[in-house]
Amino acid sequence: PPLYSSAASDVYKRQVNARGVHTMTRAVVPAMLRKGGGKIVNIASGTFYYGPPGLSHYTASKGAVIALTRCHGRELGDKNIQVNAIAPGLTESEGMQGHTGFDPARGPTVASRSIKREMVPEDLLGSLMYLITPDSDFVTGQTLNVVGGKVNL
């Protein structure tokens, strides 16, 4: 497929993924400051680390989420606000059916992972729970890759 085959799709993804993260952070920080701190967990994507063909606009927008997470983590750390992200791999869900890369026969996606099964939404819970509890009070600006071993950094 040609690069940016849909300009509207590119703009939408940037607005939702990058601008949405920035806007949400700006909206919640005042309340967190009043409470003496807080935790923000953004949702990035493992695609940023392996750049799948045909998804450049999506991958770039999720790369922006990772960059914003790092910057916001540095900017807000001294205010006791931790900003981190989770970067999931392709997750089997109703929303993914019919999208690029979703393979109901569980072919290439599973084969490229160290953990040989499809990822399901529940696989994100442990990472999310860690990032919202006091266990992660000294962690900020980080992105946890929850991709079943597809990408190792």
Residue ranges and their predicted role:
Residues 50, 129, 140-153:
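Short C-terminal tail/terminal secondary-structure segment
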Residues 1-8, 12:
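Single conserved hydrophobic/aromatic residue that forms the stacking wall/gate
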